[in-house]
Amino acid sequence: MPQSPRSAPGLLLLQALVSLVSLALVAPARLQPALWPFPRSVQMFPRLLYISAEDFSIDHSPNSTAGPSCSLLQEAFRRYYNYVFGFYKRHHGPARFRAEPQLQKLLVSITLESECESFPSLSSDETYSLLVQEPVAVLKANSVWGALRGLETFSQLVYQDSFGTFTINESSIADSPRFPHRGILIDTSRHFLPVKTILKTLDAMAFNKFNVLHWHIVDDQSFPYQSTTFPELSNKGSYSLSHVYTPNDVRMVLEYARLRGIRVIPEFDTPGHTQSWGKGQKNLLTPCYNQKTKTQVFGPVDPTVNTTYAFFNTFFKEISSVFPDQFIHLGGDEVEFQCWASNPNIQGFMKRKGFGSDFRRLESFYIKKILEIISSLKKNSIVWQEVFDDKVELQPGTVVEVWKSEHYSYELKQVTGSGFPAILSAPWYLDLISYGQDWKNYYKVEPLNFEGSEKQKQLVIGGEACLWGEFVDATNLTPRLWPRASAVGERLWSPKTVTDLENAYKRLAVHRCRMVSRGIAAQPLYTGYCNYENKI
C-alpha cells in the first residue's frame, strides 16, 4: 500500500526522536559527581546507565551474611530508595521509554559478621566498596556499618535531569573513613530541643557520614534528662515538666541513631555546670559563703562528702544501662574555685588532705573518684581538656577532648605525648558565627598538624563540630549546623589530600541542595538556587 503523504512527517519526527535518543546514549557522561564527603578512591567511567524507578530495586546479595531478617538493612534499603527517587514513583506514570543500557539492581553483600542487631562502636568497620556496572551494581562491606555508608554514596551518584530521567555513571569506589570518631555536639540544656529536631539532625549526620552524636544533655540552665532513679532531678531541674526527655524519648533517639550507624555519647558534666542538678538533689552542691556567713548561692559539686559519690555511683549505674555506648563524657571543664575557697568545710577537708590552697588537687581528687566509678561500670570516659591540664590522674584509655582554640596543636601534642587518645573540637565551634563563608575555615583545618610521632598522631581518634545552645533552639539549629558541619565531616572522613577549596565549593553547593531536597533546611553557601527549595 502506498504511504500516505500525511504520515511522512510523523515518520520523520519519529526518526528524529530515535536519533536524539541515540545521541543521548553516547553523550558525554558526568565524570565529577558531587560526592560528599569525598571517598578514598573513586574511578568514574564515561558510560552512563539509566535507572527506572519502576524497575530498580535494592536487595541483599545471595552470599551476604545479612538477609531479609536484618531489619536495619531492610529499613535502609527503603530509605535510600526514597532518597534516590523521592516521590517520583507516586507522582509519575510509566517511563516514556526504556533506555539502554540500564541499571536494574543494587545488591548489598555483607562479608563478615553483619552486626545487624548491634549498636555501633568506636571499633566499628565502616569500610565498603561499590562497583556500578550494567545491569547490577554491587556494594560490599564487612559489616552493616560500611553498607550504610556505601548506600549514602550510591544515592549521591544518581543524577536526575530536568526531564525526570535518572542516570548513573559506571564507577568503582573503595572507601573507608580517615578517623573513627566523627561527631556532632548538640546542647539540650541551654535550649530544649524536641525529639523530632534531634532525629532530623541524625538524618543530616548520616548524609554527611558523621557517626557520633555527642549529647550534652544537661547543664547549669536545665536538667531535661528524666532519671528513673532520681526523678526529682528533672522534676525540679528542667525548664518545665514538658521540657524533658522521657525513657521512651531516649530509646527512640538511640534506635534511630543505631539504624543510621550513629553512636550516642551522653555528657553529664561535673563538678561544674551543675546548678540544675542541685534543685532536685539536696546536699549535692557546695554552699557558698560570704566571709563566715552561708549564702543562698551554690557552687560546684561538693567533693568532700561520701554522699556525693554514693549518689553518682547510683546515677551513673543507671546511665550505663540506658546508653549502650562504651563511652560516657564526664565533662570536667570550667570549674570555678571561688565557692570552694569560701566554704569552711572545704577548707578543713583540704587541710586534712594536705592540698594546701591548690584547688586543682581537690578537683583531681573528685574527678579521679568519678573515673573509678565509670571504670567499675565497665565503661570508658571522655573528659574536656582541663582535666588533663590540671594534672588529674587519668586512667589509661581516657579520651581527652581538646576544645580551647588557643594553641590547640600544642595541646594535642601534650595529650598524645602522655599516651592518651584525643578528640579535636577546638577549631570547629559552630556556635561562633561570622559573616561570609566560614565553612572554608573549618575545611582548611588539618587535625594532625602538630609536632609528634606517628604513634602520637594515631592517638587522635577524630573530632567534633560543636553547636552550643545559648543562642540555638529548634528554630535555627538545622541551618546553623548545615552545611557548615559538612566541611568538618569531609575533613574527618576523606583522605588528607582532599583539600581543593574550589572543587569542595562546587560539590558542597550540590550537596547542600541535596540535603534540602531531603528535608534538611541547610543554609546556602552563597548566591544561587536549588531545584527543591519548595521541599522545606
UniProtKB/Swiss-Prot annotation:
Q: Does the keyword Transmembrane helix apply?
A: no
Q: Where is the signal peptide?
A: 1-31
The chain's disulfide connectivity reads 70-116, 288-339, 513-530
- What Pfam family is a match, any one? Glyco_hydro_20
User: Glycosylated residues?
Assistant: 63, 169, 306
Catalytic reactions of this protein = Hydrolysis of terminal non-reducing N-acetyl-D-hexosamine residues in N-acetyl-beta-D-hexosaminides; N-acetyl-beta-D-galactosaminyl-(1->4)-beta-D-3-sulfogalactosyl-(1->4)-beta-D-glucosyl-(1<->1')-ceramide + H2O = a beta-D-3-sulfogalactosyl-(1->4)-beta-D-glucosyl-(1<->1')-ceramide + N-acetyl-beta-D-galactosamine; a ganglioside GM2 (d18:1(4E)) + H2O = a ganglioside GM3 (d18:1(4E)) + N-acetyl-beta-D-galactosamine; a ganglioside GM2 + H2O = a ganglioside GM3 + N-acetyl-beta-D-galactosamine
Q: What does this protein do?
A: Hydrolyzes the non-reducing end N-acetyl-D-hexosamine and/or sulfated N-acetyl-D-hexosamine of glycoconjugates, such as the oligosaccharide moieties from proteins and neutral glycolipids, or from certain mucopolysaccharides. The isozyme B does not hydrolyze each of these substrates, however hydrolyzes efficiently neutral oligosaccharide. Only the isozyme A is responsible for the degradation of GM2 gangliosides in the presence of GM2A. During fertilization is responsible, at least in part, for the zona block to polyspermy.
Q: What is this protein called?
A: Beta-hexosaminidase subunit beta
Q: Which organism is it from?
A: Mus musculus (Mouse)
